[in-house]
A protein has these predicted regions:
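Charged/polar low-complexity intrinsically disordered segments
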Residues: 3, 9, 24-27
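Glycine-rich phosphate/adenosyl-contacting loop at the front of the ribokinase-like
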Residues: 33-111, 121
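Ribokinase/PfkB-type carbohydrate-kinase core domain
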Residues: 34-63, 86, 124-139, 143, ...
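Glycine/charged-rich beta-loop-alpha catalytic/anionic-binding loops adjacent to active sites
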Residues: 74-85, 130-131, 287-296
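Conserved post-catalytic alpha-helical subdomain immediately downstream of the catalytic base
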Residues: 102-103, 265, 269, 293-344
Length: 344
Protein backbone atom coordinates (compact mmCIF):
# COMPACT_ATOMS: atom_id res chain seq x y z
CA UNK A 1 0.00 0.00 0.00
CA UNK A 2 2.77 2.38 1.01
CA UNK A 3 4.65 1.51 -2.17
CA UNK A 4 1.58 2.33 -4.30
CA UNK A 5 1.22 5.71 -2.59
CA UNK A 6 4.88 6.53 -3.30
CA UNK A 7 4.46 5.57 -6.95
CA UNK A 8 1.32 7.73 -7.17
CA UNK A 9 3.15 10.67 -5.63
CA UNK A 10 5.97 10.27 -8.17
CA UNK A 11 3.45 10.19 -11.01
CA UNK A 12 1.71 13.30 -9.66
CA UNK A 13 5.02 15.16 -9.31
CA UNK A 14 5.98 14.24 -12.89
CA UNK A 15 2.55 15.27 -14.13
CA UNK A 16 2.81 18.60 -12.30
CA UNK A 17 6.23 19.25 -13.88
CA UNK A 18 4.86 18.35 -17.31
CA UNK A 19 1.86 20.68 -16.90
CA UNK A 20 4.18 23.48 -15.73
CA UNK A 21 6.49 22.96 -18.71
CA UNK A 22 3.58 22.95 -21.18
CA UNK A 23 2.15 26.09 -19.53
CA UNK A 24 5.49 27.90 -19.87
CA UNK A 25 5.79 26.88 -23.52
CA UNK A 26 2.24 28.08 -24.18
CA UNK A 27 2.94 31.39 -22.43
CA UNK A 28 6.04 31.90 -24.56
CA UNK A 29 4.06 31.03 -27.68
CA UNK A 30 1.29 33.49 -26.81
CA UNK A 31 3.84 36.18 -25.95
CA UNK A 32 5.59 35.64 -29.26
CA UNK A 33 2.28 35.89 -31.11
CA UNK A 34 1.55 39.12 -29.26
CA UNK A 35 4.95 40.55 -30.22
CA UNK A 36 4.78 39.53 -33.88
CA UNK A 37 3.86 42.09 -36.50
CA UNK A 38 2.97 41.39 -40.07
CA UNK A 39 4.47 44.60 -41.41
CA UNK A 40 6.72 47.31 -39.94
CA UNK A 41 6.93 50.64 -41.72
CA UNK A 42 9.91 52.98 -41.50
CA UNK A 43 9.39 56.43 -42.96
CA UNK A 44 9.02 60.17 -42.59
CA UNK A 45 6.45 61.19 -39.98
CA UNK A 46 4.85 64.13 -41.79
CA UNK A 47 1.71 66.22 -41.19
CA UNK A 48 -0.08 67.05 -44.46
CA UNK A 49 -1.46 70.55 -45.02
CA UNK A 50 -3.85 70.34 -47.98
CA UNK A 51 -4.66 73.36 -50.17
CA UNK A 52 -6.34 73.81 -53.55
CA UNK A 53 -4.51 75.92 -56.15
CA UNK A 54 -4.59 76.64 -59.87
CA UNK A 55 -1.82 75.84 -62.35
CA UNK A 56 -0.59 79.45 -62.28
CA UNK A 57 0.33 79.09 -58.62
CA UNK A 58 2.66 76.23 -59.51
CA UNK A 59 4.16 78.16 -62.44
CA UNK A 60 4.68 81.34 -60.40
CA UNK A 61 6.45 79.38 -57.66
CA UNK A 62 8.60 77.25 -60.01
CA UNK A 63 6.92 74.02 -58.94
CA UNK A 64 6.73 70.96 -61.19
CA UNK A 65 3.31 69.34 -61.11
CA UNK A 66 2.97 65.88 -59.53
CA UNK A 67 6.40 65.95 -57.89
CA UNK A 68 7.76 66.57 -54.40
CA UNK A 69 10.11 69.47 -53.64
CA UNK A 70 12.06 69.81 -50.41
CA UNK A 71 11.75 73.26 -48.81
CA UNK A 72 12.98 74.88 -45.61
CA UNK A 73 10.64 76.18 -42.92
CA UNK A 74 10.81 79.78 -44.19
CA UNK A 75 9.89 78.79 -47.76
CA UNK A 76 7.10 76.55 -46.47
CA UNK A 77 5.52 79.44 -44.55
CA UNK A 78 5.91 81.80 -47.52
CA UNK A 79 4.07 79.38 -49.82
CA UNK A 80 1.31 78.96 -47.25
CA UNK A 81 0.81 82.71 -46.70
CA UNK A 82 -1.93 83.33 -49.25
CA UNK A 83 -3.50 79.88 -49.33
CA UNK A 84 -6.66 78.58 -47.75
CA UNK A 85 -6.08 75.37 -45.82
CA UNK A 86 -8.65 72.73 -46.77
CA UNK A 87 -7.51 70.10 -44.30
CA UNK A 88 -4.65 69.20 -41.94
CA UNK A 89 -4.07 65.47 -41.44
CA UNK A 90 -1.29 63.12 -40.38
CA UNK A 91 0.55 61.74 -43.39
CA UNK A 92 3.87 60.42 -44.63
CA UNK A 93 4.01 57.91 -47.47
CA UNK A 94 4.82 54.69 -45.60
CA UNK A 95 2.79 55.82 -42.58
CA UNK A 96 -0.26 56.15 -44.85
CA UNK A 97 0.32 52.60 -46.10
CA UNK A 98 0.74 51.27 -42.56
CA UNK A 99 -2.52 52.88 -41.41
CA UNK A 100 -4.28 51.35 -44.42
CA UNK A 101 -2.87 47.93 -43.49
CA UNK A 102 -4.06 48.36 -39.91
CA UNK A 103 -7.55 49.24 -41.14
CA UNK A 104 -7.53 45.94 -43.05
CA UNK A 105 -6.94 44.09 -39.77
CA UNK A 106 -3.18 43.53 -39.91
CA UNK A 107 -0.81 43.83 -36.95
CA UNK A 108 1.51 46.68 -37.94
CA UNK A 109 4.14 49.01 -36.54
CA UNK A 110 5.83 52.25 -37.57
CA UNK A 111 9.20 53.84 -36.84
CA UNK A 112 9.45 57.58 -37.45
CA UNK A 113 10.42 60.83 -35.73
CA UNK A 114 8.32 63.74 -34.56
CA UNK A 115 9.04 66.63 -32.19
CA UNK A 116 7.52 67.23 -28.78
CA UNK A 117 5.23 69.91 -30.17
CA UNK A 118 1.51 70.17 -30.90
CA UNK A 119 1.72 68.55 -34.34
CA UNK A 120 4.04 65.81 -33.09
CA UNK A 121 1.74 64.84 -30.25
CA UNK A 122 -1.30 64.87 -32.54
CA UNK A 123 0.58 62.69 -35.01
CA UNK A 124 1.41 60.12 -32.33
CA UNK A 125 -2.15 60.13 -31.00
CA UNK A 126 -3.49 59.57 -34.51
CA UNK A 127 -1.37 56.45 -35.01
CA UNK A 128 -2.34 55.11 -31.60
CA UNK A 129 -5.98 55.55 -32.55
CA UNK A 130 -5.34 53.49 -35.71
CA UNK A 131 -3.79 50.68 -33.59
CA UNK A 132 -0.28 51.12 -34.97
CA UNK A 133 2.46 49.83 -32.63
CA UNK A 134 6.00 51.11 -31.94
CA UNK A 135 5.05 54.11 -33.90
CA UNK A 136 7.09 57.19 -33.02
CA UNK A 137 10.24 58.60 -31.55
CA UNK A 138 9.44 61.94 -29.93
CA UNK A 139 12.36 64.36 -29.68
CA UNK A 140 12.33 67.45 -27.47
CA UNK A 141 14.32 69.77 -29.69
CA UNK A 142 14.01 73.08 -31.47
CA UNK A 143 13.34 71.51 -34.88
CA UNK A 144 9.56 71.17 -35.39
CA UNK A 145 7.61 68.18 -36.64
CA UNK A 146 7.77 67.73 -40.41
CA UNK A 147 5.02 69.14 -42.60
CA UNK A 148 4.04 68.69 -46.24
CA UNK A 149 2.13 71.32 -48.21
CA UNK A 150 -0.04 69.37 -50.65
CA UNK A 151 -1.22 71.52 -53.54
CA UNK A 152 -4.17 70.09 -55.44
CA UNK A 153 -4.83 71.49 -58.92
CA UNK A 154 -8.21 71.32 -60.72
CA UNK A 155 -7.13 68.11 -62.52
CA UNK A 156 -6.81 66.46 -59.06
CA UNK A 157 -3.03 66.09 -59.40
CA UNK A 158 -1.00 66.74 -56.27
CA UNK A 159 2.25 68.68 -56.00
CA UNK A 160 4.09 68.53 -52.70
CA UNK A 161 6.41 70.93 -50.88
CA UNK A 162 7.91 69.18 -47.88
CA UNK A 163 9.65 70.63 -44.85
CA UNK A 164 11.07 67.49 -43.25
CA UNK A 165 11.78 68.95 -39.81
CA UNK A 166 12.46 66.23 -37.25
CA UNK A 167 11.35 63.53 -39.70
CA UNK A 168 14.56 64.10 -41.63
CA UNK A 169 16.69 63.25 -38.60
CA UNK A 170 15.99 59.51 -38.60
CA UNK A 171 19.21 57.52 -38.24
CA UNK A 172 20.66 54.11 -37.46
CA UNK A 173 20.05 54.69 -33.73
CA UNK A 174 16.29 54.84 -34.33
CA UNK A 175 16.14 51.38 -35.93
CA UNK A 176 15.40 48.85 -33.19
CA UNK A 177 16.53 45.45 -34.50
CA UNK A 178 14.25 43.60 -32.06
CA UNK A 179 11.21 45.35 -33.50
CA UNK A 180 12.37 44.77 -37.08
CA UNK A 181 12.86 41.05 -36.44
CA UNK A 182 9.30 40.74 -35.10
CA UNK A 183 7.83 41.72 -38.48
CA UNK A 184 7.35 39.56 -41.55
CA UNK A 185 7.99 42.50 -43.90
CA UNK A 186 9.83 45.78 -43.32
CA UNK A 187 8.49 48.52 -45.62
CA UNK A 188 10.59 51.63 -46.29
CA UNK A 189 10.21 54.75 -48.43
CA UNK A 190 12.68 56.29 -50.85
CA UNK A 191 12.01 59.74 -49.36
CA UNK A 192 14.12 58.72 -46.34
CA UNK A 193 17.23 59.22 -48.44
CA UNK A 194 16.66 62.96 -48.73
CA UNK A 195 18.07 63.92 -45.33
CA UNK A 196 20.28 62.61 -42.54
CA UNK A 197 22.31 59.42 -42.78
CA UNK A 198 19.86 56.93 -44.28
CA UNK A 199 22.29 54.42 -45.73
CA UNK A 200 23.27 52.89 -42.37
CA UNK A 201 19.65 52.99 -41.17
CA UNK A 202 18.47 51.27 -44.36
CA UNK A 203 21.15 48.61 -44.18
CA UNK A 204 20.41 47.93 -40.51
CA UNK A 205 16.68 47.59 -41.19
CA UNK A 206 17.09 45.42 -44.28
CA UNK A 207 19.71 43.12 -42.74
CA UNK A 208 17.48 42.53 -39.70
CA UNK A 209 14.25 41.87 -41.62
CA UNK A 210 12.81 38.64 -42.99
CA UNK A 211 11.61 40.45 -46.11
CA UNK A 212 12.18 44.06 -47.14
CA UNK A 213 10.10 46.27 -49.41
CA UNK A 214 10.53 49.84 -50.59
CA UNK A 215 8.60 52.46 -52.51
CA UNK A 216 10.69 54.55 -54.92
CA UNK A 217 8.47 57.47 -53.78
CA UNK A 218 8.91 60.11 -56.49
CA UNK A 219 10.50 60.72 -59.90
CA UNK A 220 12.83 63.45 -58.63
CA UNK A 221 13.68 61.31 -55.59
CA UNK A 222 14.79 58.54 -57.97
CA UNK A 223 16.90 61.00 -59.96
CA UNK A 224 18.55 62.31 -56.77
CA UNK A 225 19.49 58.85 -55.49
CA UNK A 226 19.48 56.66 -58.58
CA UNK A 227 22.77 54.85 -57.91
CA UNK A 228 21.79 53.86 -54.36
CA UNK A 229 18.25 52.90 -55.35
CA UNK A 230 19.44 50.73 -58.22
CA UNK A 231 21.76 48.83 -55.89
CA UNK A 232 18.95 48.33 -53.36
CA UNK A 233 16.47 47.10 -55.98
CA UNK A 234 18.93 44.72 -57.63
CA UNK A 235 20.66 43.26 -54.58
CA UNK A 236 18.90 43.92 -51.27
CA UNK A 237 15.14 44.43 -51.54
CA UNK A 238 12.61 41.62 -51.88
CA UNK A 239 9.80 43.88 -53.14
CA UNK A 240 9.97 47.19 -55.02
CA UNK A 241 6.98 49.51 -55.54
CA UNK A 242 7.13 52.19 -58.24
CA UNK A 243 5.02 53.99 -60.75
CA UNK A 244 5.84 53.74 -64.44
CA UNK A 245 7.83 57.00 -64.58
CA UNK A 246 9.91 56.16 -61.50
CA UNK A 247 10.96 52.68 -62.59
CA UNK A 248 11.81 53.91 -66.11
CA UNK A 249 13.95 56.69 -64.63
CA UNK A 250 15.68 54.15 -62.39
CA UNK A 251 16.97 52.11 -65.32
CA UNK A 252 17.24 55.11 -67.68
CA UNK A 253 14.87 53.99 -70.41
CA UNK A 254 11.89 55.33 -72.34
CA UNK A 255 10.76 51.86 -73.38
CA UNK A 256 8.55 50.03 -70.87
CA UNK A 257 9.62 46.67 -72.33
CA UNK A 258 13.07 47.35 -70.85
CA UNK A 259 11.43 47.56 -67.42
CA UNK A 260 9.90 44.11 -67.84
CA UNK A 261 13.24 42.66 -68.96
CA UNK A 262 15.01 44.30 -66.01
CA UNK A 263 12.48 42.98 -63.49
CA UNK A 264 12.74 39.45 -64.88
CA UNK A 265 16.53 39.58 -64.77
CA UNK A 266 16.87 40.61 -61.10
CA UNK A 267 14.40 37.89 -60.03
CA UNK A 268 12.74 40.00 -57.34
CA UNK A 269 9.12 41.09 -56.98
CA UNK A 270 8.58 44.40 -58.78
CA UNK A 271 5.14 46.02 -58.52
CA UNK A 272 4.34 48.88 -60.89
CA UNK A 273 1.36 51.25 -61.01
CA UNK A 274 0.57 52.59 -64.49
CA UNK A 275 -2.28 55.06 -63.97
CA UNK A 276 -5.10 54.43 -66.43
CA UNK A 277 -3.25 51.34 -67.66
CA UNK A 278 -3.70 49.61 -64.31
CA UNK A 279 -0.97 47.82 -62.39
CA UNK A 280 1.54 45.05 -62.96
CA UNK A 281 3.51 42.61 -60.80
CA UNK A 282 6.63 40.93 -62.18
CA UNK A 283 8.33 38.06 -60.37
CA UNK A 284 10.92 35.92 -62.15
CA UNK A 285 9.24 35.08 -65.49
CA UNK A 286 5.71 35.65 -64.16
CA UNK A 287 3.87 38.80 -65.24
CA UNK A 288 0.44 39.57 -63.78
CA UNK A 289 -1.66 42.61 -64.72
CA UNK A 290 -4.73 44.26 -63.24
CA UNK A 291 -6.96 46.79 -64.98
CA UNK A 292 -7.61 50.21 -63.46
CA UNK A 293 -11.12 50.91 -62.21
CA UNK A 294 -13.09 53.20 -64.50
CA UNK A 295 -15.58 56.08 -64.09
CA UNK A 296 -14.19 57.30 -60.78
CA UNK A 297 -14.94 60.75 -59.36
CA UNK A 298 -11.33 61.71 -58.68
CA UNK A 299 -10.75 64.44 -56.09
CA UNK A 300 -7.15 64.00 -54.95
CA UNK A 301 -4.37 61.67 -56.14
CA UNK A 302 -2.18 62.22 -53.06
CA UNK A 303 -2.52 58.79 -51.46
CA UNK A 304 -2.96 56.66 -54.57
CA UNK A 305 0.42 54.93 -54.43
CA UNK A 306 0.43 54.66 -50.63
CA UNK A 307 -2.91 52.89 -50.46
CA UNK A 308 -2.11 50.74 -53.47
CA UNK A 309 0.97 49.49 -51.59
CA UNK A 310 -1.18 48.86 -48.50
CA UNK A 311 -3.64 46.74 -50.46
CA UNK A 312 -0.94 44.78 -52.27
CA UNK A 313 1.08 44.12 -49.10
CA UNK A 314 -2.11 43.01 -47.33
CA UNK A 315 -2.59 40.39 -50.01
CA UNK A 316 1.06 39.39 -50.12
CA UNK A 317 1.55 38.97 -46.37
CA UNK A 318 -1.70 37.00 -46.11
CA UNK A 319 -0.57 34.67 -48.92
CA UNK A 320 -3.01 35.79 -51.59
CA UNK A 321 -2.02 35.39 -55.24
CA UNK A 322 -0.30 38.17 -57.17
CA UNK A 323 -3.55 38.78 -59.06
CA UNK A 324 -5.59 39.06 -55.86
CA UNK A 325 -2.97 41.32 -54.28
CA UNK A 326 -3.01 43.64 -57.30
CA UNK A 327 -6.80 43.79 -57.16
CA UNK A 328 -6.72 44.71 -53.46
CA UNK A 329 -4.18 47.43 -54.14
CA UNK A 330 -6.28 48.78 -57.01
CA UNK A 331 -9.41 48.70 -54.86
CA UNK A 332 -7.87 50.78 -52.05
CA UNK A 333 -6.18 53.16 -54.47
CA UNK A 334 -9.50 53.76 -56.24
CA UNK A 335 -11.19 54.57 -52.92
CA UNK A 336 -8.59 57.03 -51.67
CA UNK A 337 -8.47 59.16 -54.83
CA UNK A 338 -12.21 59.85 -54.55
CA UNK A 339 -11.66 61.80 -51.33
CA UNK A 340 -9.34 64.58 -50.16
CA UNK A 341 -6.41 63.33 -48.08
CA UNK A 342 -4.30 60.19 -48.05
CA UNK A 343 -6.04 58.23 -45.30
CA UNK A 344 -9.36 56.39 -45.48
Amino acid sequence: MAESIVKLEIVLVCLAKFVKAVTQIEKKRLLQRKLEMKILGIGNAIVDVICKVNDNFLINNNLTKSTMKLVDEKEFQKLLENLKIERTISGGSVANSIVGLSQLGNEVGFIGKVSDDHLGRKYAEGLEKEKVKYHYNIKSESIPTGTCLILITPDSERTMCTFLGTAGKISEIDIDEKIVKQSKITFLEGYLWDKGDPQKAFNKAISSSSQSAMSLSDLFCVERHREYFLDLVKRKLNITFANEQEIMALIKTKNFKDVIDFAKKIKKLVVITRGENGAMAIQNDTIVECNAQKNLKIKDLTGAGDLFAAGFLHGHVNKLSLEESLKKGTELSSKIIQQVGARL
